[in-house]
Amino acid sequence: MLIRVEIPIDAPGIDALLRRSFESDAEAKLVHDLREDGFLTLGLVATDDEGQVIGYVAFSPVDVQGEDLQWVGMAPLAVDEKYRGQGLARQLVYEGLDSLNEFGYAAVVTLGDPALYSRFGFELAAHHDLRCRWPGTESAFQVHRLADDALNGVTGLVEYHEHFNRF
């Protein structure tokens, strides 16, 4: 298994994985549109020994109170059903966080199960007076600081790219 930055030839495999992993094709369309419009900050794939995409995570820019603070949102994260339970999601997330830290990004936000994401260092964004536009997500919206001062004096609405409006 190999984890690496996605390349153009991976797009069909990523699309197929996302369509298999989620109830609708919304996530596949989201990644396609972010990629096509140049708003995919980082996409990482996990491939098997034959080069087939078996895992994927995407990161795209977010604004806080309308400002670009070098924050990104992590979504979607998917692992092929046959490879779940082997730590592949953890490896994808950690590789992404490490790369983003090296690139100088300040923080990462995500929507998901706190029991899962807290293991990666995410904490509830509401504890820092941060929220996203979707009502009822307070218990799922989380933040991970990459820079020590990323959360200093930062509060308010975290806005994802308009392509996320489909959700």
Curated annotation (Swiss-Prot):
Coiled coil: none annotated. GO terms for molecular function: acyltransferase activity, transferring groups other than amino-acyl groups. Its EC number is 2.3.1.-. Residues 1-148 form the N-acetyltransferase domain. Disruption phenotype: No visible phenotype. PROSITE patterns: GNAT (PS51186). SUPFAM superfamilies: Acyl-CoA N-acyltransferases (Nat) (SSF55729). The keyword Transferase applies. Keywords: Acyltransferase, Transferase. CDD domains: NAT_SF. GO terms for cellular component: cytosol. It comes from the Bacteria. Pfam families: Acetyltransf_1. Upon overexpression suppresses small RNA (sRNA)-mediated RhyB-silencing of multiple RNA targets; overexpression leads to partial loss of RhyB sRNA and other sRNAs. May act via Hfq. Belongs to the acetyltransferase family. This is Uncharacterized N-acetyltransferase YhbS. It comes from Escherichia coli (strain K12).
